[in-house]
Amino acid sequence: MPKRELWPAGSCSEPVTHIGSCGSMMSTTSTHSGSSDSSYDFLSAEEKECLLFLEKTIGSLEAEADSGLSTDESEPATSPQSFRALPTTTQRAPQGKPEARDTQQVPVPVPKRAAQSSGPPESPSPGLRSGSYSLPRNLHLGRSQNLRKSATQTNSVSEAPEVFLEEPKKGQTRQGAKTIQPPAPSQEGTPDLNTVLIPPPEAFQDITSKKAEGESPPKKPGEQTHRPQGHILERSPHSQKKADMSSETMTHKATEKGWTEGPQRPQQPPTQPSQNTQAEEPSLPSGVKPNIQQSLLTATKPRRLPPNIVLKSSRSSFHSHPQNWLSNHTEATDSGPVSSLQEQRKARREALEKLGLPQDQDDPSLPVNKHTGSFKVKEAQAQTSSQARAPAQPASPALVRGTASVAEKASSVKAITPLDSLSKGWIPAQETPPGKVGAAKSMPIPIPKASKENSSLTQSKPDPRLTLQESSIPGLRQMNFKSNTLERSGVGLSSYLSAAEKDPGGQTSTSLGKSPFLDKVSSSVFRNSRPRPASLGMGKDFAGIQGGKLVGLEQGQCSQQPSFKGQSHDKLPRPPCVSVKISPKGIPDGHRREALKKLGLLKE
C-alpha cells in the first residue's frame, strides 16, 4: 500500500499509546505506575476476559521461548504498556484504544524482549524521531511512520514485527515528551490506523504469528488497558532473562548484518533498544526457521508411516517397494514366518503348475531340496537384510532403499522358475527380527542367527548360493519346454527323472533330444511306471493280435511316417504311432484300418 501522507512527519504526531513489546514492562510499570489503574476504565467485561486469557497464554509462550521458538511472533505487539501511557491525557486513552486494536492486527507481538529496552527507552525520543523517517532498518520509528511502513511492509511478516517492536520504545520516549504530542494528530491518526493496518497475507504469515493474530484481536484492547502492573512485573523477569539471552546472540547477528542505526546512535540509550529490536529482527527469521524445520520434521514422520500401511498389502509389494519390507520388517512379519512357509509352498505349487511339472515330486523331495535351497536363499537375504537393518532403522530411508535395491537384485537373480516364488515367500521371514525368525519358523534350521554371526560374510556368500541353486536349475531348465509335452502326454516328471538316472547318456542322441527322450518315455516309463487303466485292458490282450500283422504294419507306418509328414520329428515332438498301439481287444482289423486312414497314418 502507498504510504499515507496524511500523517505529519514529526514524531509529535505519534500518540503516547504506542508503547509496544520493545518497551520493557518494567519501565512501563515504573513510569506509568500511577496511570495503569486508570486504563481499566476503558475495559469492558469481554476485554477483561481477554486480559485473563492473555495472562494464561503467557506461560505457554514463555515455554515456547525456552524451547527455542521465537517468542517474537507469539505475543501481541502492543502490550498494556501502551495504555499505561494513555492516562497522561484523557483524550489519548480512547484514542489509544482503537489504535491499539488496529495495531494488534499485525501478527508480530514481542513483549518478552521489552525488558531489554526497559531502562533507556524514554530518553531517546529525539533520536527516535530523527530515525523514524528511514526504512525499518532504523529500528526506532514513530507509530505513524511505522504504520506507513507497515502498510508497505505487510507483504512480509518479519518487517511488520520490526515496525511494531520499534514503536513501543517511541511511546516510552514520548512519555517524557507527552506535552509535545498533541492529542489531535493522534485522533487524525486513528482513522488512518484503521485503514492502514492490514495483516500480511496468509502466505507470508508464520504459524505462530497466525496464532498470535487469533489471540490478539480480542485480547489486545483489553490487554493494553487491562494488564495490571503486577502482571507486568510477573512477566518482566522472564522477559528480561530471555531478552538478555536473545539480545546477546541477536546483537551479534545484527552487528554482523550491519544494521544501520543511523541517527539513533547519538544517544547510547536509544542504541541499546535498537540493538534489542535488531536482535528481534534477526530473531524473526530465526524464529521462522525453527517453524520451517519443525514442519519438515513433522513432514518426514508421515513419510515413514506410509510404508507401515503398504506393508499389509500384497506380497508382490516387496519388489515394488523393497524399502517397506526392510524398514518395517518387524511390524509386518510377526505373523509372517508361520504363514510364509504356507505361502511359499503355495507359490511353489503354482510355479510348478505353470511349468507343467507334477506336484508329486514336490512333496517328498522339495522339503529336502527346495526347503534347503530356500533356506540358503533366505540365509543370504537375511544376512543382507541384517546388514540393512543396522543402518536402515536409525538411518534415512535412502539407506533402506539402497539395501533394498541390493536385496532386490539378489532376489531377481534367484527368481528363476519356482525360485521367484521362493524368494517372495521367504522375504517376510528373513526380515523378521532374527530372534523371532528362529522361534517362529516351523523349519528347524537356525539361519537367522547365522545371519547375525556371519553378517561380515554376507556379500561373499550370496554368490555361491546363487550358483548352487542355478546349478540345480539347469536340469529343470532343460526340462522346461519338455514339460509342456510331458503335461500333454501325461508323463510324470518323477518317472522321467528315474529313467534319466538309469540311462543318462541317451538324451543327447538327436539334435533336439526330443524323440529319443519320448521314445524312452513311451517304452520304459509310460508302460512300467504308471499303473495301467482298467479300461484299456491288460497288456496280455495286445500280445497276439492278428498274428503280429499289426506290429509289422505299425513298424512300416513308423518308417513311412517321416517321409509322409516330412519334418515331423522337427516340428512334432510326440513319438510316432504311440496312439496306434493302444487298441482294445475286440475291434476287428477293418475298423482299425479305416481309422488309421482317416487319421492319415495308413497309406495304401
Swiss-Prot record:
**For bias kind Polar residues, which ranges apply?**
68-93, 143-158, 311-330, 556-566
Q: Does the keyword section mention Phosphoprotein? A: yes
Q: Which residues form a coiled coil?
A: none
Main location (coarse class): cytoplasm
Chain intervals with Basic and acidic residues compositional bias: 208-259, 343-353
| Compartments where located | Cytoplasm
**InterPro entries registered for this protein in UniProt:** SARG
Q: Which UniProt keywords apply?
A: Cytoplasm, Phosphoprotein, Receptor
Phosphoserine carried by residues: 132, 134, 396, 411, 522
Q: Where is this region: Disordered?
A: 20-41, 64-411, 424-484, 497-541, 553-592
Which protein family is it in? Answer: Belongs to the SARG family.
Q: What is this protein called?
A: Specifically androgen-regulated gene protein
Species name for this entry?
Rattus norvegicus (Rat)
